């Protein structure tokens, strides 16, 4: 009897876990969305020119002067850039 209860419980847990995995697969990958729809861009992702708040976190600032890439991309901020971004009051994370 204990074996049957344990087996039934295991099957229920397995069914719930597989359903949540399917849900995750159906969700849109945030990396595939344009920066404007994501709310903010990760490091080395396109960003909005002149808007450091378009880069996620306190570590990212928008850099439009990359020698090998056209356009603007988020980069790791230096100490002064981090301080300037903090005072801007960006609302993204």
Curated annotation (Swiss-Prot):
Gene Ontology molecular function terms on file: toxin activity
Keywords, in A-Z order: Disulfide bond, Secreted, Signal, Toxin
Post-translational events: Contains 5 disulfide bonds.
GO CC terms: extracellular region
Propeptide regions on this chain: 19-38
Organ and tissue specificity: Expressed by the venom gland.
Similarity comment: Belongs to the neurotoxin 31 family.
Protein name: U12-lycotoxin-Ls1a
Source organism per UniProt: Lycosa singoriensis
Highest classification ranks of the organism: Eukaryota, Metazoa, Ecdysozoa, Arthropoda, Chelicerata
């Amino acid at each position: 009897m204990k074996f049957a209860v344990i087996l039934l419980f295991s099957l229920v847990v397995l069914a719930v876990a597989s359903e949540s995995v399917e849900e995750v697969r159906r969700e849109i990958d945030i990396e595939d969305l344009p920066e404007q729809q994501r709310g903010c861009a990760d490091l080395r992702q396109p960003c909005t020119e002149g808007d450091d708040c378009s880069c996620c976190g306190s570590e990212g600032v928008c850099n439009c002067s990359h020698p090998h890439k056209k356009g603007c991309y988020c980069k790791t901020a230096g100490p002064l850039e981090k301080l300037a971004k903090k005072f801007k009051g960006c609302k993204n994370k």
